[in-house]
Amino acid sequence: MDAGLKRELEQKVRDGERLTREDGIALYESDDLAWLGGLAHEVRTRKNGDVVHFNVNRHLNMTNVCTASCAYCSFQRKPGEKDAYTMRIEEAVRLAKAMEGESLTELHIVNGLHPTLPWRYYPRSLSALKEALPEVSLKAFTATEIHHFETISGLSASEILDELIEAGLESLTGGGAEIFDWEVRQHIVDHATHWEDWSRIHRLAHEKGLKTPATMLYGHIEEPRHRVDHVLRLRELQDETGGFQVFIPLRYQHDFVDMKDGKVRNKLQARTTMATGAEALKTFAVSRLLFDNVPHVKVFWVMHGVQTAQLALQHGADDMDGSVVEYKITHDADNYGTPNKLGREDLLDLIRDAGFRPVERNTRYEIIREYPGPDAERRESPQPMRV
C-alpha cells in the first residue's frame, strides 16, 4: 500500500467516514500489521476506552446428532454412531447447575440438527434451565437451528421465536453464518440456511427486541474479498435493525486427528492451511474498521488461543468472551493445547497482562462489576506469540 492511500484511509477513519468495499480489500492487502492494528485500536478505544469485557458462561451442546455434514465441522455425528449423544433435559440442567457457585451469568446453547428430536424438546429445555437458574441468561440456538425448527414443527420462525422467548430465551447465538458468499458457501455448508434465511431470522429476532451476535468463519477457502463482503452484508443489516451487539470472527480449526472412532470429519483440512496469528490479527483489525455500527468485537479465545486473543485486544477487539467450560464444537477439531476453561481470575490476569481494564458483563452488555486495571509490576507486553 502506498503512502498516499495510507494517509487517505487514516483520514477517513479519524473523520468517522464509512469505509467502502475497496477500502476493506486494500486494508487486507496491506502488509503493515502494526499500522493496521494501530488504526483499529484507535477505533476500538474511541468506542470502548481501555475496557475489555468478559462474562462467566457455560456452553451446552445438548446433542451432536446432525442431519448436515458441513465440510468444516468435526462435531456432528449421524444417528447410531457410537459417540453420538442427546442429553435428557434433566442432564442439561444438572450440568448447568454445577457452575452455580461460580456466579454463572449465561448459558450458551448450540446443537446439531437432530432429525427426529421433537420441536417441543427445545422450549421445554429452556423452561427447565430458566426454572433451575432464574438469574442466568439463556443465549441459545443459531439461525440454522431456528430454520431447522421451522421444518420439524411446521411453525413459522416468528412463532418459534415467540415460544422460545416465552420459555426464557434472551438472545440467539451468532453461528451458522460462516461465509455468506455462495461462491464459498456451496463448498463448505451442507444445510439449507443461507444468507436469505439467516438474515430473515436475525431480523425477526431484532424486531422482537432480542439483541444478537454475528459471526464469520475465516481462514479456510475464502479470500479477503469474501470476508469484506460478509462484513458489509452484516453492516447493512445493522443499519436497518441495530440489533447486533457484537461481531465475532472465528478462526477455522483443523481436525483433532485422534478422534475416538478414528474418523476425520473435517473435510476442508486437506485443502487448507490454518490462518496464522498475523492473519487472525489482520482479520480483527479490518473487521473493526469496516463494521463501524456494531459496538463490540469479540475474540473467542477458545478458537484463537490465549496469546493471540491478548494481541487481538490491541487490534480492535474489546471482548474476550468468558469462562466457556466444555466447548465441544471447537475441541472436537482442536489438538493445539487451547484450554477448555478459564476461570474468572484467569481472565482477569489475561486482560490486565495485555494492558486493559477488565469489566464483567452479562449477555446484554450490562456491567456486573468493574475491576482494577493493570498494575505497574506487569510486564510491558503480552507473552510472545508465533505469527
Segments and roles (model prediction):
Residues 96, 123-127, 161-162, 199-202, ...:
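Generic structural signal for well-ordered alpha-helices
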Residues 156-160, 221-235, 304-314:
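Catalytic cores of alpha/beta
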Residues 16, 40, 70, 109, ...:
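Conserved, mostly hydrophobic/aromatic
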Residues 1-34, 94, 100, 238-387:
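Auxiliary Fe-S-binding modules of radical SAM enzymes
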Residues 35-79, 84-110, 172:
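N-terminal pre-triad scaffold of radical SAM enzymes
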Residues 104-202, 206-214, 220-221, 296:
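Conserved SAM/AdoMet-binding glycine-rich loop
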Residues 57-59, 80, 110-120, 182, ...:
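Glycine-rich, proline-tolerant flexible connector loops at the mouths of alpha/beta enzymes
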